[in-house]
Structures are given as C-alpha cells and as structure tokens.
Design a protein with these regions (language model features):
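Alpha-solenoid helical repeat scaffolds
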Residues: 1-215
C-alpha cells in the first residue's frame, strides 16, 4: 500500500528499471512496459514486453497482442506474426475476427502468403464485411491460385461493405484475365469503371453540399 502511494508522487520508472535487472519477474517487466508507454517511449515499451516474452513470462492474450502490435508498428512483421502465432499455438489467444485478421496481415506483410491464407479464410467467414475475402483473393492471386482467387473476390463482393469496391472489380478482372476468362474479365473491368464513376459522383455531390453549407 505504501509503495502504491509512493508511485502516485514519484517517478518510479528508474526503480522498475533496476528491479528488472535484479528480479526479472513478469509483473516488473509488464509494469515497466506500461510506464514506458505512458511516457510515450514505444520502442522501450516494446523492448520490455519483448524481454518478458523471450523469458517465457507472457501468458495473457492482451500481452501477446500488445507485443505483436508494437513489433508490427516498428516494421518487424515476421516477429509480430511469430509472437501471435505462438499465442494461438499455446491457446492463449482466442480465434476471433480481430486476432485472426491481425495474424493474417502480419504473415501477409512478411510475404508468407501460404501462412496468411488460412487465417484470412477463417476471419473472412466470421466478418460481416467482405473486405477480408478481398485480402484472401489477393493472397490466392499472389500464389497463382486463380480459381480460388476468383471465388474469394466474388464472395467479398457479395458480402459487400467494401472500402474500395471498384478496386475489387479491377482485381477480379485481372484474375479472370490471368485465368484466360476473357469475356468475364472485360465485364469486370467495365464494372470497375461504372462503380468508380458512381463513387466519384457521390464524392463530388458531398463536396458540393459541404461548400453550400459553408456559404
């Protein structure tokens, strides 16, 4: 209790920095990581969590996800993927949309397309939006799996709520072209143009409405 009161009045960061050197317990590493975070020192925040992970001390989902997010932020997607994958393997991390999506994206960013594929597939099935099927289609396309890529993109378009519907039609056209489905490819490219024109018209109208409100 006394130490808790002192923590409110003192900068305890140096104390924890000494503690982890002599008594490298999980609670000291995680608290040190949190203190670095409060002081806007994300690299040190990551380093403290990484040290705890390397010593096998992390055992909660939020700890694995926090470390993987920091690693990804500092452009180390492969280690981010390995950390999160380890959490899945140890049954520490639940298979839910956000965790499956994160692992898929980390493997994707690491150019490990075959490893990203099953996690995009699981996440896409759970998601209420079609975006993850588009990512799955990109992965299949990158692996020259044109038929699977085509089906994934179609599922994404069907599910809808896409950030870039025109881009999805463009990608589908490319896949169909590579699969020598010429007529279908042309239809997709035309659909891409139609959707892009509609999106531009909507955007232009919104801008006009904003300008009118300013006047």
């Amino acid at each position: 209790a006394l130490f808790s009161e002192l923590k409110r009045d003192l900068d305890v960061l140096p104390i924890y920095e000494v503690l982890v050197q002599h008594y490298p317990k999980k609670q000291y590493w995680t608290q040190l990581s949190g203190l670095y975070g409060q002081k806007d020192r994300p690299m040190d925040q990551m380093g403290a969590l990484e040290a705890a992970y390397d010593d096998g001390l992390l055992n909660k989902q939020r700890e694995f996800t926090a470390l993987s997010q920091l690693l990804f932020m500092f452009e180390n997607p492969r280690k981010a993927a390995n950390v999160l994958q380890d959490g899945f393997n140890k049954k520490v991390i639940k298979e839910e949309e956000k965790t499956l999506k994160a692992l898929a994206q980390y493997w994707h960013a690491s150019k490990e397309l075959s490893k990203a594929k099953p996690y995009y597939k699981k996440a896409a099935k759970i998601s209420k939006e079609g975006e993850l099927y588009i990512f799955l289609g990109q992965v299949h396309f990158g692996l020259d799996e044109f038929s699977d890529a085509r089906e994934a993109i179609k599922l994404g378009l069907k599910k809808g709520k896409l950030k870039d519907e025109a881009g999805a039609h463009m990608l589908l056209g490319q896949i169909l072209f590579e699969n020598q489905e010429w007529d279908s490819a042309i239809v997709s490219f035309r659909k891409c143009i139609d959707v892009a024109e509609k999106q531009y018209s909507v955007k232009k109208k919104k801008q006009k409405d904003k300008d009118k409100q300013k006047d």
